[in-house]
Structures are given as structure tokens and as C-alpha cells.
Amino acid sequence: MSMPATLTKTTKLATSLIDEYALLGWRAMLTEVNLSPKPGLVDRINCGAHKDMALEDFHRSALAIQGWLPRFIEFGACSAEMAPEAVLHGLRPIGMACEGDMFRATAGVNTHKGSIFSLGLLCAAIGRLLQLNQLLTPTTVCSTAASFCRGLTDRELRTNNSQLTAGQRLYQQLGLTGARGEAEAGYPLVINHALPHYLTLLDQGLDPELALLDTLLLLMAINGDTNVASRGGEGGLRWLQREAQTLLQKGGIRTPADLDYLRQFDRECIERNLSPGGSADLLILTWFLAQI
């Protein structure tokens, strides 16, 4: 991909540094999909509420996406002198090419489209911050990503077109802004809730997998997950949020014995055909940002 004339032609960032952050993105995707048991989601135990995808699809998908993550970082660095609102337009072709490789790797199955959007944004934000020698923390990464997305919800969801996308329909019916709204707001569900929750559990000495599973429950309880709403409507979303909140109120996932509750929750999600894919995407970001 040739860089537009408005971009800096080169970046001062070392290839090793770019590859380090790209590797974290790949590890984040693998960490999420291998985490088990996850209610309604593909994991090492079963395919959740999905009949068209399996664990191996996610492994192949993550590997295909890994090769593109350095491009997002490089573009973020090379566009560092541009107005942040102009960056998203330049990221789109990279994202579309990355999606193409994902679909080729999975024979047409959409495994990680949401993660391409969110990880692409965060990787570009990391590139920009590094290029400008600015403080790189989870908060600054997410606020920089948010600056790329100013006006995104208005442009893409608030429309009166007769042919609505699934996202536009859910916004008009339920007021859910999904991945676009979370990105434009700077990922508050991650920064204000999931990430501090996860880090606190780790500080308390909880097993990292149990801590991640408990954090997933938290995200499921508070996230207006458009993946769930598209499958089960408002009723399905509210049910899933209530069930997750109930498990948290009972103490969450603190011991291996608590996994029985998650297995039952998984069975119920499968019966209802509900998959909290939006919360899974946010869990990927949570783990990724926890490494920074």
C-alpha cells in the first residue's frame, strides 16, 4: 500500500518495536478464543452458539490478521502529523485488505471482523503516540483511537436510508451504538470497568484464566452487545445481562468449581442461540491493554 502524499514517508520506529506490539495483538486474539468455558462463544470445549465456525478457524484467522497489525501501527506513525479525524479514512483500506485475508483463511467465515476494527484502531493509536514521543498508556491509546473516530456514530448510524444495515437497525430500535460508539467514546467499558477489574484480580493473586473469565462476565453484564441483540433482540440481551450480573453477585469466577456455573450459562446461551461476540472483542482489548 503506497502512502498518500499527506503522510510522513518514513517512521522512526524500530521494526522490532512494531513487531512487539503486533505480536501482542495476535496473542490477545488467541488468549480470548482459547479461554474456556465461555458462554455462547467458541472455545476449546465447543463452538458455542455458532454452527459455522470452530476453534481452528479462529487460530487461522488470528494468524492472518497478525501480518496486518504492523501496517496499522506504521500508518498510525506515518500519519502522526495529520489531524486525527483524517486518520480513519486511511486506515479503512488496510482494514479491508486485512478482512480479505481473514475470509480467505477461514473459507468465508467472519471470525474477527470486530477485532480488525478495534485492534486496528489501537495499533494505529500506538504508532501515533510512539512517533510523537507521547505517553503510551491504556488511557492515552484509547483516547487517541477515539480521536480517530470523532463523528463516526453520527455518520454511519444516524441515517434515514431505507436499506438499513444491522448496526443502523439496532441503533434505531434499541439505541445501541456497538463497536463504533465504544470506539468513539474511547472504550470506556474497557478503561473504566474491565481493565481495572482484571488487573485488580491479578493483583489479588487470582489465576489469570479465572480472572479473564470473571472479566468477561463483567463485560457481558454491562455491554449493550449488538451481537446478542441481533440474535435475540432486546429480550435476549437483557436476559444475558441479568444472568451475567447474577453470577457476579454470587461471587463471580474465583475457583475452578465456579466453572460449573459458566458451563450451565454456556448451555443456556446455546439453547437461546446467543453469542456475546461484542464482549469477546472487548475482552481481547482488555488483555492487550493490560500488557502495555
From Swiss-Prot:
**Keyword annotations for this protein?**
ATP-binding, Nucleotide-binding, Transferase
Disulfide linkage: none
> What one GO molecular function would you report for this record?
ATP binding
Q: Which reaction does it catalyse?
A: 3'-dephospho-CoA + ATP = 2'-(5''-triphospho-alpha-D-ribosyl)-3'-dephospho-CoA + adenine
* Pfam families referenced in this protein's UniProt entry, alphabetically: CitG
Enzyme Commission designation: 2.4.2.52
Q: What does the entry give for GO biological process?
A: prosthetic group biosynthetic process
Similarity comment text for this entry: Belongs to the CitG/MdcB family.
What exactly does this protein do? Catalyzes the formation of 2-(5''-triphosphoribosyl)-3'-dephosphocoenzyme-A, the precursor of the prosthetic group of the holo-acyl carrier protein (gamma chain) of citrate lyase, from ATP and dephospho-CoA.
Q: What is this protein called?
A: 2-(5''-triphosphoribosyl)-3'-dephosphocoenzyme-A synthase
Q: Which organism is it from?
A: Escherichia coli O157:H7
